[in-house]
Amino acid sequence: VVDINPNLDFEKELDEFLEKNHHGEMAWMEKRSNCRSNPNILWDEAQSIIVLGINYHFECNSLELLSEKNKGIISVYSRNSDYHKIIKKKLKSLSFEISKLLNCSFKYFVDTAPVMEKPISMKGGIGWQGKHTNLVSKDFGSWLFLSSIFVDKKINNTRPEIDHCGSCSSCIDVCPTNAIVEPYKLDATKCISYLTIEHKGIIDKNLRKLIGNRIYGCDDC
């Protein structure tokens, strides 16, 4: 649980990301950046955010097919039903139960609204943002779908998670395209997930060989 207050401000990091054009063709990040940096613009009556994560990794080695060049690799998260529909159904049910318990109104979001799920989840104690900028959980690694429930009532905060990365650089070292330009800084225009999902144009020749047989997304980091 995270309290919405003036200290819940992600504007500096977001502005830097956008100014460097590290978001590439994801113009939707610019259009509602004010909502991302201030959750109350999204809903001015919101007082607390309940953040949630659901593990989506199954028993498989997500990198085992990299050497089999006659096969295309699809990111683990998209090998099942659309997670938006599954999580929204769960969120709706949970939100109604919370509203009855706390006598409050609510709005719930999963990935499609301008909510900074990762830093909010860190403040809410689910995990910490690793050097690859993904959220890392002690129990589930980076294999989490994140969602949130906004409520118009103050709830006691949970303890924020701290950064446990230390001197580890595994995520940086494993990135095929060097998209993690420095610890905690991602250039999405070099990221294979961006290039194979969000990018609609021609992929730079220098990046094509590095992408290998990944045809939709990337799970390396």
Q: Over which residues does each language-model region extend?
A:
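Auxiliary alpha/beta "docking" domains used to position bulky ligands
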Residues: 1-164, 203
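A broad, structural surface signal
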Residues: 48, 89-100, 169-173, 209, ...
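A short, flexible beta-alpha/helix-coil linker loop
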Residues: 156, 197-198
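Processing junctions and N-termini across compartments
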Residues: 159-165, 185, 212
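Iron-sulfur cluster-binding cysteine motifs and their immediate structural context
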Residues: 170-194, 200, 211-221
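Short linker/helix segments within small regulatory modules
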Residues: 203-209
